[in-house]
Amino acid sequence: FADDIVALFPEPGSAIDVALEIHRRLQLFNTSPLASEHPTLCCAGVGYGHVLAIGPNLAQGDEMNRASKLGEDIARGNETLVTQRVHDAVAAREDIVFERQDHDDLLFPFYRVTEAE
């Protein structure tokens, strides 16, 4: 069972912040009395670039496609993966760590994002 959410942000740092906050909150939820025996997890993919808006609720573009692939097919529970463009835009941040990843099926570079210790 899976649900997808697409959210647009003015810059990629905000998208990363929200993804990491979702992971934190789900970890708290999973330790609460409301949690089931199966943990609730989030897999996130983040891209950065121009999108083509098609009506009020749909957008398309290369980075949207890459982010979707990363979030839906590659990321594991509580993992945020970002494209090269996201990495390049926010690489100077000291509060997060980027780990370059390899995947045989993908033709584009991507990174795993975690909070710095």
Q: Model regions: which residues?
A:
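Short glycine- and acidic-residue-rich catalytic loops of nucleotidyl-transferase/cyclase enzymes
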Residues: 1-3
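Short, surface-exposed, charged loop/turn segments at secondary-structure junctions
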Residues: 58-62, 94-96
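Catalytic cores and conserved motifs of cyclic dinucleotide signaling enzymes
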Residues: 55-58, 78-80
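Short, solvent-exposed loop/turn segments at secondary-structure junctions
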Residues: 8-9, 51-55, 89-90
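Arginine/glycine-rich "motif VI" loop of SF2 helicases in the C-terminal RecA-like domain
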Residues: 71-76
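Intrinsically disordered, glycine/charged-rich C-terminal tails and inter-domain linkers
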Residues: 77-117
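Generic structural signal for isolated residues within well-ordered alpha-helices
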Residues: 69-70, 89
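Alpha-helical scaffold within the catalytic cores of cyclic-nucleotide enzymes
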Residues: 5-44, 48-50, 62-69
